[in-house]
Structure formats: C-alpha cells, structure tokens
C-alpha cells in the first residue's frame, strides 16, 4: 500500500510541476510574441519536449527534466523558482 500511495503522490507532484511550467510558458510566449518552434530552436530544447510541456494536463506521465526547466529560465532571464511558480520564503 505504501508504494501505491507514494506513486500517487509522485504523480500529483509531477503533474503539478508540468502544469506550472506550461502556465509559465503560455504567459511568456504570449508576452514575447514567440512560438513553440522558435523557443525550441533558441533554447536547444527538442520541439517534441516543448510540445509535451504544452500538453501537460493531457500527458499525465510527462515530467520535464531539470535541465529543460533551467534552459527555459535562462532564456527568459529568470529563476527556476519563477518557472515552476515556487514561492521562496526569506527567513531574515
């Protein structure tokens, strides 16, 4: 039972991550007025990977790699936390 629960939890986290990257890309592609093909070319991310990100809800098994998220962050001059919409708390 533990393995099953762990798998479900992992799947939910992966879906949430893929969905967050998708939402970030939808916003940025619109702002920058660029398309998926151009993004794939300038970031050296395979077009199929960009397409899979953009179909995040439909593709439940897809989880973008950290390297892919890093390339997206570098291109848009932001942090990986911004790409995945993770809130960073300062404890100062």
Curated annotation (Swiss-Prot):
Q: Where is the HTH cro/C1-type domain?
A: 25-83
Q: Where is the signal peptide?
A: none
Pfam families listed in its UniProt record: HTH_26 (PF13443)
Q: Which UniProt keywords apply?
A: DNA-binding, Transcription, Transcription regulation
GO terms, molecular function: DNA binding
Q: Which SMART domains match?
A: HTH_XRE (SM00530)
Residue intervals annotated as DNA-binding region are: 36-55
Note the PROSITE patterns from the entry: HTH_CROC1
Task: Tell me the InterPro entries matching this sequence.
Answer: Cro/C1-type_HTH, Lambda_DNA-bd_dom_sf
What is the protein name stated in its UniProt record? Answer: Uncharacterized HTH-type transcriptional regulator RP766
Taxonomy, top ranks, is: Bacteria, Pseudomonadati, Pseudomonadota, Alphaproteobacteria, Rickettsiales
């Amino acid at each position: 039972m533990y393995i099953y629960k762990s798998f479900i939890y992992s799947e939910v986290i992966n879906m949430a991550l893929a969905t967050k990257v998708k939402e970030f890309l939808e916003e940025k592609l619109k702002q920058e007025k660029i398309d998926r093909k151009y993004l794939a070319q300038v970031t050296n991310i395979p077009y199929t990977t960009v397409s899979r990100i953009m179909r995040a809800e439909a593709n439940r098994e897809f989880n973008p790699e950290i390297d892919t998220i890093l390339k997206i962050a570098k291109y848009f001059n932001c942090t990986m936390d911004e790409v995945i919409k993770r809130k960073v708390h300062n404890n100062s």
